[in-house]
Amino acid sequence: MTKEHSEQQKDLRIRSKVISEGVSRTPNRAYLRALGFEDEDFQKPMIGVASTWSEVTPCNMHIDGLARASKQGISEAGASPLIFNTITVSDGISMGTDGMRFSLPSREIIADSIESVVSAENLDALVAIGGCDKNMPGCMIGIARLNLPAVFVYGGTILPGKLDGKDLDAVSAFEGVGQYNNGEIDKEALHKVECAACPGAGACGGMFTANTMSSAIEAMGMSLPGSASHPAVSTNKSKDSRAAGKAVYKLLEKGIYPKDIMTKEAFENAITVVMALGGSTNAILHLLAIAHTIEVDLTLDDFEKIRKRVPHIADLRPSGKYVMAHLDEVGGIPAVMKLLHDKGLIHGDCLTVTGKTVAENLEQQPDLTDNKSIIDFDNPKHATGPLVILKGNLAPEGAVAKISGLSVTYIKGPARVFDSESKATKAILNDEIKPGDVVVIRYAGPKGAPGMPEMLSASSILVGKGLGESVALLTDGRFSGGSHGLVIGHAAPESQVGGPMALLEENDTITIDAEKLEISFDVSDEELERRNKQWQAPPLKANRGTLAKYAKLVSSASKGAITD
């Protein structure tokens, strides 16, 4: 018997067989017959399609069609597909409001729900489709928990908005608020930006969190080559989804599981691509969480080790000129990976969802067609990666800074301390913040907020007011992938558990040195001891529901803000 014939005969119902066969499972099958199952369908593996379709965000408004394309691909491959939904929240719409506290917890809800449905229904494999920021890590954590054959599909990037011949993105609207407050544009001009920034379906267009994570997942080998950069409205995106349905069936046939793909070296490939592209600080948090789930030993030190050897080569927003759709036009993530592989920065022997290795996937990949305007390895934006891990007496477990596009990587100035983003934003808009200040937003961590919200409103207004390189912004919360300027987040331990930020007082001198990888404040040990004795943890800001449960379970940001 040939190997091919043997594979065809292999029973791929690795879990669903407990429902598909046996007299005692007659009632179970009756429910599936209501869905249209016939006798022959029970002889096939059952493959789930986890859809994050929703009308609460443009990132996900089109995903139902992609889920149906994946369903078609699964059927054509010879399996029985079942679509189910999970949630999404819109980071952009909730930004700057209390709703932003639910963004990071939604990552866990997505993972929990995917794990729950696939486990309860005894599905054999999975295609997961995500659009907005937390969809990607949520789907990947769910995939890692299940360790069943799986392919991730990214819903795709939005196209750039157009106004007066210039490209816009969602961050243009956030920064426009600062420009309006500073008197640089009037209300009519701001309204035009609002109306033009987001032209249709897809996730935020720059190298923000969604595009960063889609790139990381493709580099890790868990998405089909090229799919990370295809725009949401392109015909390629539907093709990606259909192909994913066929690919997951092949993984099931070959017995290839996420643990076979998501190795330490695969995570190193993901980090390498994130550093080269100048990706979001959120990638650090999410990759730590995914690695924990798949039982790969990944720490902040691994990010710093890779950062030192990988140049930042992409001129992408938020600090650069171009968006993901432009990168797609010149070859996308495969072309970037081929360049990095040729330079010896990528592990080529890692397995991927194609069933081939990274190197095998890249063999037929054309080189970048860019004239070095978007990607330039020989003249990088920075000789090392832009996501810097800082440590010191203000963040003993670490903090994350993004230095892309900055001419200033050092600041020493007085702390301007706020216990909420809204208070800090009000002070910025009222011109109470001056060049040289270090704005501190604390009690914004995983437990303290709870939910570790992003500070895009505050950071964007600073940039819009021309203070992006003269005022630092420090928090135990997060920053959007759209944030730029001198921003430092993820400070750990967080304030809520008595981290050093909780002991800061107005006008304490803070030193941030991205070159020396240091973050500290000039307060004597004796004074710190006195403050520590007086400090009391404030009551948690949620005592029931989603946020209360999250606050009780969540770990430090330095561990990925995991909940298990």
From Swiss-Prot:
Which GO annotations describe the biological process of this protein?
isoleucine biosynthetic process; L-valine biosynthetic process
Q: Which cofactor does it need?
A: [2Fe-2S] cluster; Mg(2+)
Q: Which residues form the active site?
A: S480
Question: Record-annotated residues binding Mg(2+)?
Answer: D91, D133, K134, E454
Q: SUPFAM superfamilies of this UniProt entry? A: IlvD/EDD N-terminal domain-like (SSF143975), LeuD/IlvD-like (SSF52016)
Q: What pathway does the annotation place this protein in?
A: Amino-acid biosynthesis; L-isoleucine biosynthesis; L-isoleucine from 2-oxobutanoate: step 3/4; Amino-acid biosynthesis; L-valine biosynthesis; L-valine from pyruvate: step 3/4
> What do we know about how this protein assembles, alone or with others?
Homodimer.
**Protein task:** Functions in the biosynthesis of branched-chain amino acids. Catalyzes the dehydration of (2R,3R)-2,3-dihydroxy-3-methylpentanoate (2,3-dihydroxy-3-methylvalerate) into 2-oxo-3-methylpentanoate (2-oxo-3-methylvalerate) and of (2R)-2,3-dihydroxy-3-methylbutanoate (2,3-dihydroxyisovalerate) into 2-oxo-3-methylbutanoate (2-oxoisovalerate), the penultimate precursor to L-isoleucine and L-valine, respectively.
Family the UniProt entry places it in: Belongs to the IlvD/Edd family.
Stated name of the protein: Dihydroxy-acid dehydratase 2
